[in-house]
């Protein structure tokens, strides 16, 4: 199951609720700048000047009379201004080479107010700013100070002094209101606001490929959302909630959108993490607001993605019953169980961790149904690939059926990524159509990452990698019935120097003991080939991942599946996540003595498989050399070439290079077999000895325990 291209989703943006204007749009920034400049001007305009020292009125009067009566151009007033806030004169007086500044408190004497200065002796006074009310002295006639000096209005002065404070408060209020518009209701602090996004989706079930059973399970809910009264009249109770579980990328969210699109009802989307906040009670309030708004739009769908973020089992976290997450979960339980019967409100949720959810969520009346959206089978994968390939120019040689067989275990999201990677490769290589080779490369990219062709590898190391991968292919071809070696490559990808792709001819959900043993033997084929060619002391670290996988299977055979001499007993309980496949803990249910026996059984299975791999490669040494040569020549060989080599014991003519050294190497295979025969027998004797030693150790341990 998978989602359509992003371009199709963009065409539906018109159905979404318009976004609220942000607090930092261009218009708001301009307003902020204007207000800030106004504030700066007011502050500086009303800041008191520092005119110097205080001078008595008599001293000021003397300076004024001297400047007016004396015929000396070097004595004059440069500036006289009146401070309406502080009610005083600010004076700048020039006396020859000396310039002094002082201030004079506003005089109330009648002599000053009635002072008259003859204009004829008004020499060098420079009273362009003596105009206390910005009036210029012309130097002619008589200047009456009483007409120029107006007593200050104290109330006005106080009001003007408060302007900066009022302006500052206004700016704060303005910013607060703008934040309120952007965040809704409570300015920049509204933690309880509903975080769900309401959208109308046009996605239909026809836009989804695969998982037909899941679509049928959900389809009846569409009819309920369209005709809720029909179900009420018949006495039926439609599930209030549906939980979609499954691995990542299988289309759980897309399925919920398609349900809303088919029913043509509002769709409220929210992530489980949106309910969890720092402040206590915020999550519970958001749950209440979400359901309150959804009921107003009933019928509607509430979809909670990643439900495990808020729906984990209570009591398992830090904080006990006062944990904020638990309060949010309690509110969610109440809202789901407290809804009016058949109110037209459907709750859907998706999670990859159904194993950690609180049992109260899964009981009838809340999430009545739990639907597992699993990985697609081969038929579903083919349908998904065809769905995503619509509108793309693809070569006629591409078979989606074969591509589906080559991608076992891929989710819908990964299959969409395969199509997209192939399209990108087509653009990069400037081809008009997407070729089969580009699809092959896209599958390899999604599986293991891009090829590292620039990595410098010595010829000896490359030959060792070729032998290693050829060993896997030989054992897999000869032992694993129903499994096809699809592709072998020695091109480095990721951390691997090469890889061997084996896929089952038919997908199976259960494996027999013989199939598991064959799988382990196939994993040991690479290391076995290295032992035969280079000796036991020269095996490389390239088998690390093979050993890890083989050991994991062998241990599960002993501890979980009862496929050993210890009998059908479960010694370890696997608590790994069913969809994510990760082992978090292992519950040990056995004694130390049983633990030693388990280790011995695991070792016995691995060593027996390794010995079997050596025997198979020894019997098919010629095939090993041919596959190695094909890999060194072409770096990658596919199923048809592998089958040709296995059947005819020669390289395919279309891939063979006319090099005498290669022909000579192939002709001398019998000599190589003879040379390593003794070495193989030595390895076999060593492995037999290891197995016997392990069995003897068990017997010794048992005798000690009995004693």
From Swiss-Prot:
It is a multi-pass membrane protein. The chain crosses the membrane at residues 26-46, 129-149. One of its GO terms (biological process) is protein catabolic process. It is an enzyme of class 3 (hydrolase). The keyword Protease applies. The active site is at 469. Its EC number is 3.4.24.-. The keyword Cell membrane applies. InterPro entries: AAA+_ATPase (IPR003593), AAA_lid_3 (IPR041569), ATP-dep_Zn_Metalloprotease (IPR050928), ATPase_AAA_core (IPR003959), ATPase_AAA_CS (IPR003960), FtsH (IPR005936), P-loop_NTPase (IPR027417), Peptidase_M41 (IPR000642). Keywords: ATP-binding, Cell membrane, Hydrolase, Membrane, Metal-binding, Metalloprotease, Nucleotide-binding, Protease, Transmembrane, Transmembrane helix, Zinc. Homohexamer. Acts as a processive, ATP-dependent zinc metallopeptidase for both cytoplasmic and membrane proteins. Plays a role in the quality control of integral membrane proteins. NCBIfam families: FtsH_fam. This is ATP-dependent zinc metalloprotease FtsH. The gene is ftsH.
């Amino acid at each position: 199951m998978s989602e359509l291209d992003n371009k199709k989703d963009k065409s539906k943006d018109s159905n979404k609720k318009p976004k609220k204007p942000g607090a930092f749009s261009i218009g708001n920034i301009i307003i902020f700048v204007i207000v800030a400049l106004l504030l700066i001007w007011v502050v500086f305009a009303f800041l008191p000047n520092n005119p110097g020292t205080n001078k008595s009125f008599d001293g000021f009067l003397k300076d004024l009379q001297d400047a007016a009566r004396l015929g000396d151009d070097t004595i004059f007033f440069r500036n006289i201004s009146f401070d309406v806030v502080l009610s005083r004169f600010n004076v700048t007086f020039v006396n020859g080479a000396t310039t002094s500044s002082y201030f004079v408190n506003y005089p109330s004497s009648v002599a000053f107010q009635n002072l008259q200065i003859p204009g004829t002796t008004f020499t060098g006074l420079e009273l362009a700013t003596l105009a206390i009310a910005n009036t210029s002295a012309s130097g002619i006639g008589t200047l009456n100070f009483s007409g120029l000096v107006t007593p200050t209005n104290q109330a006005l002065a106080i009001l003007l002094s408060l302007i900066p404070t009022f302006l500052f408060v206004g700016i704060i209020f303005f910013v607060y209101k703008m934040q309120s518009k952007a965040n809704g209701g409570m300015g920049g602090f509204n933690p309880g606001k509903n975080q769900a996004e309401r959208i109308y989706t046009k996605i239909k079930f026809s836009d989804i490929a695969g998982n037909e059973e899941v679509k049928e399970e959900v389809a009846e809910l569409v009819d309920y959302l369209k005709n809720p009264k029909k179900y009420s009249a018949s006495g039926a109770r439609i599930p209030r909630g549906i939980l979609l579980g499954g691995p990542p990328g299988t289309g759980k969210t897309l399925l919920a959108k398609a349900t809303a699109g088919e029913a043509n009802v509002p769709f409220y989307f929210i992530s489980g993490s949106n309910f969890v906040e720092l402040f206590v009670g915020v999550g519970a309030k958001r749950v209440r607001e979400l359901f309150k708004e959804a009921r107003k739009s009933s019928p509607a769908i509430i979809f909670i993605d990643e439900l495990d973020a808020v729906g984990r089992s209570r009591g398992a976290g830090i904080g006990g019953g006062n944990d904020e997450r638990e309060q949010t979960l309690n509110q969610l339980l109440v809202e789901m169980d407290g809804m009016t019967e058949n109110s037209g409100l459907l709750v859907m949720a998706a999670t990859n961790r159904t194993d950690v959810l609180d049992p109260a969520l899964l009981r009838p009346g809340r999430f009545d149904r739990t639907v597992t959206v699993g990985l697609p089978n081969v038929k579903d994968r083919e349908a998904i690939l065809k769905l995503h390939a619509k509108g793309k120019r693809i070569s006629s040689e591409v078979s989606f059926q074969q591509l589906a067989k080559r991608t076992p275990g891929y989710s819908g999201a990964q299959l969409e990524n395969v199509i997209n990677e192939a399209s990108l490769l087509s653009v990069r290589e400037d081809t008009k159509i997407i070729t089969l080779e580009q699809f092959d490369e896209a599958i390899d990219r999604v599986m293991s990452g891009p090829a590292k062709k620039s990595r410098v590898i010595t010829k000896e190391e490359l030959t060792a990698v070729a032998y290693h991968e050829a060993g896997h292919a030989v054992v897999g071809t000869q032992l694993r019935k129903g499994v096809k070696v699809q592709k072998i490559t020695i091109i480095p990808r990721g951390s691997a120097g090469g890889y061997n792709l084996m896929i089952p001819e038919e997908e199976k959900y259960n494996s027999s003991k013989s199939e598991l043993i064959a799988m382990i033997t196939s994993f040991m084929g690479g290391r076995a080939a290295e032992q035969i060619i280079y000796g036991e002391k020269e095996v490389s670290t390239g088998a690390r991942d093979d050993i890890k996988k083989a050991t994991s299977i062998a241990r599960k055979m002993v501890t979980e599946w009862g496929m050993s001499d210890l009998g059908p007993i479960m010694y370890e309980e696997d608590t790994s996540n069913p969809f994510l496949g990760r082992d978090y803990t292992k519950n040990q249910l056995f004694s130390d003595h049983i633990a030693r026996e388990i280790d011995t059984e695991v070792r016995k299975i691995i060593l027996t498989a390794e010995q079997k791999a050596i025997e198979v490669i020894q019997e098919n040494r010629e095939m090993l050399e041919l596959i190695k040569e094909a890999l060194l020549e072409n770096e990658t060989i596919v199923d048809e070439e592998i089958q040709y080599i296995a059947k005819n014991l020669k390289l395919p003519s279309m891939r063979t290079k006319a090099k005498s050294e290669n022909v000579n190497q192939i002709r001398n295979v019998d000599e190589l077999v003879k040379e390593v025969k003794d070495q193989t027998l030595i390895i076999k004797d060593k492995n037999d000895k290891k197995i016997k030693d392990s069995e003897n150790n068990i017997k010794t341990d048992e005798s000690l325990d009995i004693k």
